[in-house]
Amino acid sequence: MNINLLGIKKKTVSVSQYINSLKQPFRDKFLKRKQTYQLEQETINQLKKFAEKIVIVAFSAEWCKDCTANIPVLALISEATGLEVRIFGGLQKDPSNPKRKWRIPPSPPEVKTFDVDKIPLIVIVDREGKNVGKIIEKPREKPTLEEELLKIILEKH
């Protein structure tokens, strides 16, 4: 599936805008994670090489613990490397409809396009809109988010 990055940019916010727009107490939780997390510097140096080639698109909700753990790390990665990180925020479950996971709206309709089941869904896309890979909820194969991102990118580039 090719992804329309221009369309995505119009419907998303930067990761820093997303965190700053959160309501309390969620904003403080995200900011605390951002302030206390230490990036793996060697991995960050390698990720810098891909700043002009890769865009990260993530789906998030303020109430989600895995989002609280990983979206602030994406903000740090973006700041340290120049990688563009775009966020679809405000996802809400739909308890009234067992056949549908997300309530649309307020969840963006892209939850269907990207087949979002669990969050955060972190999608790595090249500048041509080709899907490079994804991380669902948290890193699975590497100990840190930045190492998992680098692993996925290196497998395709």
Residue ranges and their predicted role:
Residues 113-157:
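Non-catalytic, surface beta->alpha helical segment in thiol-disulfide oxidoreductase systems
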Residues 59, 74, 83-106:
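Thiol-based oxidoreductase modules, predominantly thioredoxin-like and allied folds used
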